Amino acid sequence: QIWNMEGFGSGNQVQPGMCAYGATKRAVNYVNKALQKEVKGTEVQVCTLSPGIVITDLLLGDYDTSSPEWEKSKKIFNILGDTVATVTPYLVDGILNADKSGAKVVWLTGGKAFSRFMTAGFNKRDLFADL
């Protein structure tokens, strides 16, 4: 199995400061589709992981946590984000259960994102309490 990981840019999102990262993640879609065609008829499986927003040092490294921009981003991260410890078991289970090329393991689905926004006022999360 070959697994590639999507990220910001995979779904055509564009944001200043994310050019290189977003371009490489957008390329993941093309690479996976092309590889799936190239290995068709073989035992090789080409699959995709889509972890959603995971709170990591890579994500946080470019933010000035004393800025107003950080406060806006932090609100979104607390609604849509998750910790590595939360997301990893789900991704691993998906990998272990994938049985065909083209499999995609998605943590933050559109439905889950919608639900989180709808319940954000009642379900206060603070993924940054330990920062």
Model-derived segments and spans:
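Hydrophobic structural elements of the Rossmann-like NAD(P)H-binding subdomain
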Residues: 3-5, 46-49, 59
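C-terminal helical subdomain
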Residues: 48, 65-123
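N-terminal charge/polar-biased segments
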Residues: 122-131
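Catalytic loop of short-chain dehydrogenase/reductase
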Residues: 1-33, 37-40, 53
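Short, flexible catalytic-loop segment of classical short-chain dehydrogenase/reductase
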Residues: 11, 51-61, 65
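Short aromatic-enriched loop/helix-cap "lid" or pocket-rim segments at secondary-structure transitions
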Residues: 16-17, 58-62, 117-120
